[in-house]
Design a protein with these regions (language model features):
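Conserved active-site and cofactor/substrate-binding residues in soluble primary-metabolism enzymes
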Residues: 41-44, 48, 70-74, 101, ...
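Short glycine-rich loop/turn motifs that provide flexible caps or phosphate-binding loops at active sites
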Residues: 31, 63, 123, 194, ...
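Catalytic alpha/beta core domains of metabolic enzymes, predominantly
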Residues: 197-330
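Alpha/beta enzyme core
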Residues: 19, 24, 35-60, 76-87, ...
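A mid-to-C-terminal "edge-of-domain" accessory segment
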Residues: 1-30, 278-404
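N-terminal capping/small domains of soluble enzymes
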Residues: 1-98, 355, 359, 370, ...
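Short, ordered loop/turn segments at secondary-structure junctions
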Residues: 29, 65-66, 95-98, 122-126, ...
Length: 404
């Protein structure tokens, strides 16, 4: 019966199959902190976020760039100790430039804590970056391979990251990744550093990289995707990257990050679940986003999907009436879907009927009944009239006062 109530064009003939692997890397505590408008939180807040990432089944977390200074290294060490002492399933990685002085702090923390850290070694790869820096391709190859060999020689797994991959020449990508495989990289990361890529471009570059790795004897080498939101395409590009062969994609809480931010890892989790690509309990999603908001001093927009205040609220008469009818049928499944493309209960939320100037009397009656107040004709009329005269939704306290 339920299958007949919604025709889902998203999964009709030709829908992409589930990727062979679906892994997530949370960049909130590294790239997220590069946002110009957030605060680097104290270590207790970082620990809380790490635990919530773990609850959501996120595979890896980038816990910082320890080469940035003593505090950064101390925080990375503290988070590694938290992973060990709390026996968290989430694994750690850290960013570093392709220079020894950035790699050494990662080695030190690993040796002190006994916690393996994947070293995410990054270097620019696009011609525009090469021109600005005065680099040639030989420099990129030498800098990359020496850094990878040094990290691997000191017991680190390496994710080799080419910044600005989505604007790099094919021959440069081919050479850098081929040499990275030979030097011992375990994974590579295709980075859309400036948020330049479209979904088609994402699929093309990820598919190209897969071919390069296979030709270099790196069929076992996994591909990461790291995207930004400068064109508003961060989230959809993550899905395109999975379709094209990436096995791990990056994101941040609430999409925070450099400039316009990174792909929203919270919304990525939602979409992966709705696509059927993951199956896990995501009811901690609200707690995760609230914790990130409080730690980083970044408010959650009211209209933010799923976790924003407005996501599952309505005061519009026609919409509310349909939801109320579903509730009166005793069908929570129906109420969760009749005016929502995202089932609230799957993510720890519920539908909420509000009262405002566009409401009908059914909104008022439902609010009264759900708050244990008998909806007399006079009371309904009093609240309904007040709502029509208001220029916004009435808060619960105002409605309670009208109940007298």
């Amino acid at each position: 019966m339920r299958d007949e109530l919604i025709h889902d064009w998203n999964i009709d003939d030709g829908a992409p199959p589930r990727p062979s692997q679906v892994m997530l890397d949370d960049e909130t505590l590294r790239d997220g902190l590069q946002s110009p408008s957030v605060t680097d939180p104290p270590i207790e807040k970082k620990r809380e976020l790490l635990h919530l990432m773990n609850r959501l089944g996120i595979d890896t977390a980038n816990i910082g760039l320890p080469g940035a200074g003593p505090r950064a290294e101390a925080d990375v060490e503290a988070l590694c100790r938290e992973i060990a002492s709390a026996k968290l399933a989430i694994e750690a990685n850290c960013a570093a430039r392709t220079i020894v002085k950035d790699i050494d702090p990662i080695i030190r923390v690993t040796q002190k804590t006994g916690v393996p850290i994947e070293a995410c070694l990054f270097i620019g790869s696009s011609p525009i970056r090469q021109y600005a820096e005065g680099w040639d391709e030989e420099f990129l190859v030498r800098q990359s391979t020496e850094a990878i060999a040094y990290a691997v020689g000191n017991g680190l797994r390496v994710l080799y990251v080419t910044e600005d991959t989505t604007r790099a020449r094919p021959e440069t990508i081919d050479r850098l990744y081929t040499e990275a495989v030979r030097a011992g990289a375990s994974r590579v990361c295709v980075a859309d550093t400036t948020g330049h890529a479209t979904p088609d471009g994402t699929r093309r570059v990820v598919g190209f990289v897969r071919g390069v790795l296979d030709a270099a004897g790196g069929k076992h080498i996994g591909i990461d995707w790291h995207g930004h939101r400068d064109r508003g395409l961060g989230l959809v590009n993550c899905l395109a990257a999975f379709e094209a062969g990436a096995t791990r994609v990056h994101g941040t809480a609430l999409g925070i990050g450099e400039r316009c931010g990174n792909a929203e890892i919270d919304l990525l989790l939602v979409n992966l679940k709705l696509l059927g690509w993951i199956d896990r309990d995501l009811t901690a999603l609200g707690a995760y986003c609230r914790a990130a908001s409080e730690a980083l001093l970044r408010p959650v927009p009211d209209n933010y999907p799923v976790v924003g205040r407005d996501a599952f609220e309505t005061a519009t008469g026609v919409h509310a009436a349909a939801v109320i009818k579903a509730f009166k049928k005793g069908d929570a499944w129906l109420a969760d879907r009749i005016y929502s493309g995202v089932p609230a209960s799957d993510f720890g939320f519920h539908q909420l009927i509000r009262v405002g100037p566009m409401s009908g009397k059914s909104n008022v009656i439902y609010w009264l009944e759900s708050h244990g107040v008998k909806p007399t004709e006079a009371l309904v009329e009093r609240i309904f009239s007040a709502a029509k005269e208001s220029n916004r939704l009435l808060e619960d306290g105002e409605l309670e006062a009208l109940c007298g």
